[in-house]
């Protein structure tokens, strides 16, 4: 039996995550208090059906150690994955404003504005976020995008191997919050300054050929490969579910896309479970 624990900021998409898990055959329980989690799992441990539980700010224990200890205990006997969903403050505020719903902290008596509630919740959840196997930033994701991302990540975990996620991004759009490692490639030769290459992306052959002829590009790619290859066994022993590697250039169109694609394809050839995403390209 697999157990998925879904947590995160209110308005970040926990209900969407549960619907996806339900579609994938999971038995889903919404807003289960942490102190009942072990008892609940024990009651259904002989079931062949996978289980997903969402944890809400309203029923989290005041002491983060309780969640940490509960998860550590469950992981000794079950296949447990913790998913944490988050989004930028302004996006969460926008979502609540559009739906005109009350924030959970307002419902339990906190005397604060919506903006203060969002900030307070993130502060409370910071310790819980550290327990997550997978952190997803839903700021720019539609319900469909989030559903597809979750479906891909969850199905990618079926073999119980560590999933390597390579994602390109543009620094001008902000740092990805779900990355374990971030590599800055803005110092590499920029195809943007070649008029014929400017409208293309790092997935196009002319751009790939342009970058591949520069020694520093190949050297950096090989050094990142070597770094990850060296430390991958230790990361796998640490019971991680995902390793997210983000590669950033200025706009997220050329250099980061090329390096990300090359790294992803390299580790696929090594037999690893790999997912490749290009965040800036997904915006258009």
From Swiss-Prot:
GTP binds at residues 56-59. GO terms for molecular function: ATP binding; GTP binding. ATP binds at residues 8-15. InterPro entries: P-loop_NTPase, RapZ-like, RapZ-like_N, RapZ_C. It holds the Pfam family RapZ-like_N. The keyword Transcription does not apply. Keywords: ATP-binding, GTP-binding, Nucleotide-binding. HAMAP family: RapZ_like. Displays ATPase and GTPase activities. Belongs to the RapZ-like family. This is Nucleotide-binding protein VF_0384. It comes from Aliivibrio fischeri (strain ATCC 700601 / ES114) (Vibrio fischeri).
